[in-house]
């Protein structure tokens, strides 16, 4: 209900959470009959028959990707721009990633998830599983590219340096940054 009532512009995080919420309800409804029949059966650990893709992609996948669309740019913004606030023009958090790539990865990931869930429920032929899987993989690759470009374009660290803790590689003027101890 709060997502519908919100007054701010929808971001990639909001769009993914808007998929997560009904996917979670749908997964619960699909799983309920199996859990009522045999609540401790190992084959029902992750829900009823045909609900695995809905749980893995519709619930967990959209929740994780939506959260990463907020956390990664936020951490970069706090590290790079927060101390400049009020002294110079700084970008908004949502300006750090590419909106077009975010829209593309959302469409690909959603389309792939819908195809996989529909194939699981026998609403589409089994061949749709391959198509759906391909769309999910492509959407995941576009998301990863968007986040890696965000890190590359706005962080003083190289991609490897951010992971392994190397000193910053470049400053705005192209010189190697000095490490503050």
Describe the residue ranges of each PLM region.
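Hydrophobic alpha-helical transmembrane segments of multi-pass integral membrane proteins
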Residues: 1-181
